[in-house]
Amino acid sequence: MSAERSPARKPAAGVPAPAELGLLGDDLGYLLRRAQLAVFADFGETLAELQLRPGQFAVLTAIDHNPGVTQSDVCQLLGIQRPNFVAVIDDLEARGLARRTSSAADRRSNSLLLTAAGKRLLQRAVDLQREHESRLARRLGPGGRQTLLELLSRIANTE
């Protein structure tokens, strides 16, 4: 989007002119946030049938790939504030999807594991996540998903 404008049409009498974004239309942070909101809304709707939120999906995935991981390590891995994480893991534990055990290495911290029910739910969620990713890939066009992943990884410093 450039700063130049094409000639604007005058709105019909009594109809307000459409609002414009101005410099926000070229602002990376603004557009990343809008894209994140759109993607999370779709993913949230996708996971709703499992009564699972995107953040819970991320936590279950992290635990599944790192059995016995500590709460602190999951917080660091996913960028979750510890007070927020406690509520997430409390909910997952109450639903019988994850469990905490005292860490063998440091009894002051908890190790996290998925239960059998948690593994089953996560597999269903992964299937839905793949459908969600396919929808996004179609919107981005051939090669668009991979290009976007590479660019976002540069920004997020996760390469």
Predicted region positions:
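N-terminal leader segment of winged-helix/HTH proteins
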Residues: 1-50, 154
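Charged, amphipathic alpha-helical coiled-coil/dimerization segments
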Residues: 6, 10-11, 40, 68, ...
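Short amphipathic alpha-helical elements of helix-turn-helix/winged-helix folds
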Residues: 62-66, 151, 158
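The alpha-helix within a helix-turn-helix
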Residues: 75
